[in-house]
């Protein structure tokens, strides 16, 4: 699966443009601009599986660091503060990782 199978390349480019500078990544803005927030729950979970590098069923901080690069290989890494903020926004049960349901809830919140 390629991310452009479910999201428009133009929307992805626009979303990445908005957060190209360090410490400018805002999850909800990214989800809105990329079109992710308009997708169904099952489509969002498909994107989650694409982002889940090790197919563990969870996203950890290491995977979140490379979140933007899953949308475009040349995109920057998230900063440590952006990574921790993204984790805090989605990790509802406080286990230090984001499951598919938590990811979907964050995207649609």
From Swiss-Prot:
Alphabetized UniProt keyword annotations: Acetylation, Calcium, Metal-binding, Repeat
> Which cysteines does the record link by disulfide bonds?
none
For whether the record's keyword set contains Signal, the answer is no
- Residue ranges of every copy of the EF-hand domain listed in the record: 39-74, 78-109
Instruction: Answer yes or no on keyword Acetylation.
Output: yes
Can you cite an annotated GO cellular component? cytoplasm
Q: Name one GO molecular function term.
A: calcium ion binding
Where in the sequence is N-acetylserine found?
2
Tissue specificity of this protein:
Abundant in the organ of Corti.
**Annotated binding of Ca(2+) 2, by residue:** 91, 93, 95, 97, 102
Q: Which SUPFAM superfamilies match?
A: EF-hand
Matching entries from CDD domains are given as: EFh_parvalbumin_beta
Q: Where does Ca(2+) 1 bind?
A: 52, 54, 56, 58, 63
Q: Which family does it belong to?
A: Belongs to the parvalbumin family.
What is this protein for, i.e. what is its function?
Has some calmodulin-like activity with respect to enzyme activation and growth regulation. Binds two calcium ions.
Q: What is this protein called?
A: Oncomodulin
Organism the protein comes from: Cavia porcellus (Guinea pig)
